[in-house]
């Protein structure tokens, strides 16, 4: 995917996502086009606390966190495409289909998340996501998010 490069640094990401340490899983946005696609990066460090238990002696980045990183990338794309939310509104992760894990992600990897907008229907926005390491697919899924007021 090539287009005019639009990047977002961590300060801008923090303005868009409600996530914070230790659950913020997007380090930088490499490129995006509003309403179309977004490419983001997660640098995987051995210092992540979950590696103590997943798995001792054989650290593997948890698959659910790969999905969460892709979901956070969809949230950024949604915010950049729709604009600011009203006070009290959030984008919620609403569903996932066709999730597949192809290979493990380990400390030292740089994981690239590519998400593309598919459609909005009945208040749900659908995205296709893929995570790559060294150009190889590690995970792919279809994800949905919903714009909603906080309960």
Swiss-Prot record:
The gene is fabZ. CDD domains: FabZ (cd01288). It catalyses: a (3R)-hydroxyacyl-[ACP] = a (2E)-enoyl-[ACP] + H2O. GO terms for biological process: fatty acid biosynthetic process; lipid A biosynthetic process. It is an enzyme of class 4 (lyase). Belongs to the thioester dehydratase family. FabZ subfamily. This is 3-hydroxyacyl-[acyl-carrier-protein] dehydratase FabZ. GO terms for molecular function: (3R)-hydroxyacyl-[acyl-carrier-protein] dehydratase activity. It comes from the Bacteria. It comes from Escherichia coli O9:H4 (strain HS). Involved in unsaturated fatty acids biosynthesis. Catalyzes the dehydration of short chain beta-hydroxyacyl-ACPs and long chain saturated and unsaturated beta-hydroxyacyl-ACPs.
């Amino acid at each position: 995917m090539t287009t005019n490069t639009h990047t977002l640094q961590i300060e801008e990401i923090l303005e868009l996502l409600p996530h914070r340490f230790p659950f913020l899983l997007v380090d930088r946005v490499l490129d995006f086009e509003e309403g179309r696609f977004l490419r983001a990066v997660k640098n995987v460090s051995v210092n992540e606390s979950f590696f103590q238990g997943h798995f001792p002696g054989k650290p593997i980045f948890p698959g659910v966190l790969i999905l969460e990183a892709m979901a956070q990338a969809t949230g950024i794309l949604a915010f950049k495409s729709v604009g600011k939310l009203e006070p009290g509104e959030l984008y919620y992760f609403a569903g996932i289909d066709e999730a597949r894990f192809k290979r493990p992600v380990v400390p030292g990897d740089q994981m690239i998340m590519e998400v593309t907008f598919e459609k909005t229907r009945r208040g749900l926005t659908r995205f296709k996501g893929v995570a790559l390491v060294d150009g190889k697919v590690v995970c792919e899924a279809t994800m949905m998010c919903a714009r909603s007021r906080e309960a």
